[in-house]
Amino acid sequence: MQLAGKWTYRSYLNNPELVGDDAQTALSLIFGEGVFTFETPTPRTLVGTLDMGGGYVLDLKGEVDPECEGPTTLVIRGFGRDGTPTTGWEYDYYGWPGYMWPDGVDQVPSIVGTIVRAKPHNGEPAGVTASFIAVWQ
């Protein structure tokens, strides 16, 4: 799977309640949104950014493990940039490629996984988790 490039990223709070036809409730589940830009300097390393707009950027460093049991795994750490609104932020991401259906029609590559806030910031506690989906642009 090609990782280098741009991916549309969205994370969602893990709330088991159904939203029905309430669009505002559905929107309130979005934890974060932006664009992952990945580079792969080696087959096992990943660097890049998560740009959420408005100066909110995390610098990413990660590992790619294509030889683990099961699908390739991605373990990524996101660090806030000094002098920006993300100063002091730290998030961890764990993901793997979405299954590519052999008979899928117009399927776009995806990465699915989970995220945890590794350090508290802006009055929000560490340990908050969410699920994420990143879709190839």
Locate each region found by the language model.
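Short, solvent-exposed loop/hinge segments that bridge or flank secondary-structure elements
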Residues: 1-53, 119-132
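Beta-sheet ligand-binding and adhesion/scaffold domains
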Residues: 2-14, 63-137
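Predominantly extracellular/secreted and cell-surface proteins with exposed
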Residues: 29-86
